[in-house]
Amino acid sequence: MKLLLLLALLVGAVSTRHLNVDTSSLQSLQGEESLAQDGETAEGATREAASGVLMPLREEVKEEMEGGSGSEDDPEEEEEEKEMESSSELDMGPEDVQCPKEEDIVKFEGSPGCKICRYVVLSVPKTFKQAQSVCQRCFRGNLASIHSYNINLQVQRSSRILNVAQVWIGGQLRGKGHHKHFHWVDGTLWNFWYWAAGQPWRGNNSGRCVTLCARGGHWRRSHCGVRRAFSCSY
């Protein structure tokens, strides 16, 4: 009798052990399946991010570097563009243009064989249009177009010599919406740019004219009616 009871207890213990092992195996398999599904979901999310977020970001950076199209129009910019289009190219008569004194300017030469070989930086503050008038009437040129890092550096250094924070250069924003683009007022090719971080489209950037900063030499957008020092090329 005791032997039969002992055998029954042993059989029950073995059955319980097998049941625990099967349960653990089932939980392990379920866990692996869950991890596999999570991995597929993460991979799918990565692919979605790559196609839906990273590509537009690259396009935005490309547009930013090239001075390409911004999509939203600032009402102040539109008003500024209308004002510039409605008025004459030169907003000062000959009697209003006073050519600068020698102590107010720094001159330097461009590269040998260049199309635009002479540059001048002037410390007398003018609006963008007034500065363009001075460049045309006093130097028979235009606000400076910059086509290389070397010229950009020379304008920056000249600005520091005159102790001015920013100078107008000849870059100007034209167009609306996705057709916005920058151009040089002298009509030369827009083939070089040196925008500051976040310029010209990101953040709270506005204004249709371009300034060069004496600190760092980077470019920023600015409202054309602000009076600043400026640089001419001729």
Curated annotation (Swiss-Prot):
It comes from Cavia porcellus (Guinea pig). Residues 16-115 form a propeptide. Residues 133-234 form the C-type lectin domain. PANTHER family: MANNOSE, PHOSPHOLIPASE, LECTIN RECEPTOR RELATED (PTHR22803). Residues 71-94 have a biased composition (Acidic residues). MBP may play some important roles in the allergic reactions and inflammations, since MBP is capable of releasing histamine from mast cells and damaging the epithelial cells of bronchial tubes. Antiparasitic and antibiotic. This is Eosinophil granule major basic protein 2. Residues 1-15 form the signal peptide. Disulfide bonds join C135-C232, C209-C224. The gene is MBP2. Glycans are attached at S69. One of its GO terms (biological process) is immune response. Residues 26-96 are annotated as: Disordered. It is found in: Cytoplasmic granule. Keywords: Antibiotic, Antimicrobial, Disulfide bond, Glycoprotein, Immunity, Lectin, Nitration, Proteoglycan, Signal. One of its GO terms (molecular function) is carbohydrate binding. Nitrated. Gene3D superfamilies: Mannose-Binding Protein A, subunit A.
